[in-house]
Regions:
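Non-catalytic signal-transmission and effector/linker regions of two-component phosphorelay proteins
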Residues: 1-22, 27-29, 80, 95, ...
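A short, hydrophobic beta-strand element within the central beta-sheet of small alpha/beta folds
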Residues: 78-97
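Conserved beta-strand segments of the P-loop GTPase G domain that flank and frequently precede/overlap
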Residues: 14-16, 58-62, 87-91, 107
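Conserved phosphotransfer microenvironments
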Residues: 59-82
Length: 125
């Protein structure tokens, strides 16, 4: 029986955003850092892809306060189906206290995101 070493492969990330202009630099930074990243066109599409592919990390980029409820509802549906699924958000400090439900909230700083994500994932093991 072969047990997979969690550090042997890079986690697969499923990323979606309410602002398509912001998501490209984030995705590119993660790709450059060696992550595998699939991009969903919106939060609903993210849920559909998650059902099909079951990524290691589900990442919601939330730019607008009006999108918090949609992102949170998607996160809750995912967590209800798989409580162990790692769900995180990318949000400004002003949005971090508005009830986002998940495992982590990261800054949208594209240069720091890969390392911050690796650190949190390593702590989860």
């Amino acid at each position: 029986m072969c047990i997979e070493d969690p550090f042997e492969r890079t986690p697969r990330i499923l990323l979606s955003s309410d602002n398509h202009q912001r998501v490209s630099p984030l995705r590119n930074a993660l790709l450059r850092a060696g992550f595998t990243v699939d991009l969903a066109s919106d939060y609903r599409h993210l849920e559909l892809l998650w059902h099909e592919l079951r990524h290691d990390v589900v990442l919601f980029e939330v730019s607008h306060a009006g999108s918090v409820e949609l992102a949170t509802q998607s996160a809750i549906r995912i967590k209800r189906q798989d409580a162990k699924q790692f769900v995180a958000y990318l949000a400004d400090a002003s949005l971090q206290a508005v009830g986002l439900i998940g495992d982590a909230i990261f800054s949208r700083d594209a240069q720091r995101l890969p390392q911050a994500l690796r650190k949190v994932l390593a702590e989860q093991l």
